[in-house]
Amino acid sequence: MSLLGKYAGTHTADSAEMIAARERVFGEGLFEPLSGAIGAAVSDPRLEGVKGAVVDLGAGPGLYLERALEAAPERIGIAIDNSKFAARRAARCHPRAGAVVADIWDEIPLRSGSAAVILNAFAPRNGEETQRVLAPGGHLVVVTPGPEHLKELIEPLSMISVDVDKEERLHEALGPLANSLETSTLEWNLKLRRTEVADLVLMGPSAGRLDASEFESALERLSYPLSVTASVIVSTAVKTSTSESNHS
């Protein structure tokens, strides 16, 4: 289902090639530590008694939503992304999942209080709408790249570097939800083949700004297997009565 408006920013949507690269990366298990952390966050005992779906905002192909639903067998999942290629794949990520093509910068097409968990991994954040859709006692799980993330690739492959103000901007975007933010950092080492390095670059925001021939030449100059740092920050916020009253 597509709910994109006439003037929606589809130019920012992931391409079919980006989605395919992401699926190959996950198929190799390169982000398994993060997938495990998301599963643990969704099965947090504090969520017992909180009714609602697992909603993945900026879901991509639904690979994190799939792990979340495996960890929460009593819940359904909803993937929302502005890429039709991502949504098609996300709709098939799990038998209890559905997908909607929509721009999460606009009004999220869900009832107020209908989400027990909202996932937001490497995606834009709409704090006001997240606050509205999240049920009382529900959890928001945000994943952002850490300062060391893929540091060995940024300069040689002309990748976009991590924003040094990302944490500050996260707090600003979340509004009252930021008051309950709990943060942890996950780091692990990857030993990568040439094809895996290429896919890590091509699945992300750097893909659209690379010259194909220069990228191939840069890949050739690296030595494999290449040791690369993966570093992500997992932040969890709980919607409390205080955050609700602050929002109103």
For each of these PLM feature ranges, what is it?
Residues 81-84:
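Conserved SAM/SAH-binding beta-strand->alpha-helix loop
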Residues 184-248:
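Conserved Class I S-adenosyl-L-methionine
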Residues 49-60, 139-169:
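Conserved class I S-adenosyl-L-methionine
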Residues 61-73:
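Conserved SAM-binding loop of SAM-dependent methyltransferases across substrates and taxa
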Residues 11-37:
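Class I SAM-dependent methyltransferase Rossmann-like catalytic core
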Residues 105-117:
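A short acidic, Gly/Pro-enriched loop at the edge of an enzyme's catalytic core
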Residues 127-141:
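A short glycine-rich, Lys/Arg-flanked "PGG" loop and its adjoining helix->strand segment in the class I
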